[in-house]
Amino acid sequence: QNVEEIQVGEKRGREAIELLFYNLRDIYMIVENAVSEIERINPSTDDKEEVKRFDRMKNFLSKPNNKLNFIHNLSYGYFFYGVQNYYVTKNKQDVQYDINVDVTAILVVNKTSKSLFSPRNSLLGHYFRHLYQTVQFIAREENLQEDEKYNYAKMVRAQLSDFEQALLYYNSLSVMGKKWITPIGIVDIKKMCLIARFRLIKNMPYYFEYFGIKPGDFFEVEKEVWQTHGGNFFEIDLIN
């Protein structure tokens, strides 16, 4: 699927991608606020089970990495599949299931925009699959040297707009896109994840208002490795 085939309302192509990026950012902020609301709730002490349930949720969310990863997974899941169709887990014994249910309830009570939370898998599913298959094909081609593979991947990257690269990054943080960043923290460039190995998000602008897990922090190890090899992971370093 060519990016020009993607249409959202009257927006098409790269303008549609830009709109989708801001949709995702808005959803992230809404989910983040809903999670903060859950943390502030103090249930009636008369309901022991409810007190226990909230204590369990708050304990999970008190760990920064738990909270950040949960918000990323849920917000991207809502963005991709819609608010009524996505759960971070189907295991009802998992504390994340309880948080997920409560976040959804808060969104319903607050009458959050239905259009903002409409599914986008039909718009982006094939797009990301095709992009991944293209880069993976290059990575696995046995008849190419690493520098040749990099040059082919560079041509793919050159076709991606700033917002496409930003959306690719946030897709990679989700359950649906984690293969882009597996493995992480590797010091051998040839064995790095696809995004790091071929610097697929090199042109992400430093002036973007990145939310959640910042790309400069996430790829901290890979940034240092590329610098030791005389290259920059980002065209202009994303400090945060």
What are these regions (language model features)?
Residues 2-240:
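Intrinsically disordered, low-complexity polar regions and short flexible loop motifs
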